[in-house]
Amino acid sequence: MPSATRKNAPKGKCPICGAPTKAEFRPFCSRGCRDRDLLNWLGDAYRLPVKDLQAEDGDFD
């Protein structure tokens, strides 16, 4: 089966608003959604889970 080319590659949806993405702002649809995503990261709206190693080992004192 041939791999998808740019011409017939499936279009994605913007993770912020759900609109079709644009190549210039991919994976977003616009500069506004791209900037909103950045502000979410900078404002701690997004968080990565962190495992507390000190609670497990107790050897960090």
From Swiss-Prot:
Its cofactor is Zn(2+). Zn(2+) binds at C14, C17, C29, C33. It comes from the Bacteria. It holds the Pfam family YacG. GO terms for biological process: regulation of DNA-templated transcription. Keywords: Metal-binding, Zinc. The keyword Metal-binding applies. Binds 1 zinc ion. GO terms for molecular function: DNA topoisomerase type II (double strand cut, ATP-hydrolyzing) inhibitor activity; zinc ion binding. Interacts with GyrB. HAMAP family: DNA_gyrase_inhibitor_YacG. Inhibits all the catalytic activities of DNA gyrase by preventing its interaction with DNA. Acts by binding directly to the C-terminal domain of GyrB, which probably disrupts DNA binding by the gyrase. Belongs to the DNA gyrase inhibitor YacG family. This is DNA gyrase inhibitor YacG.
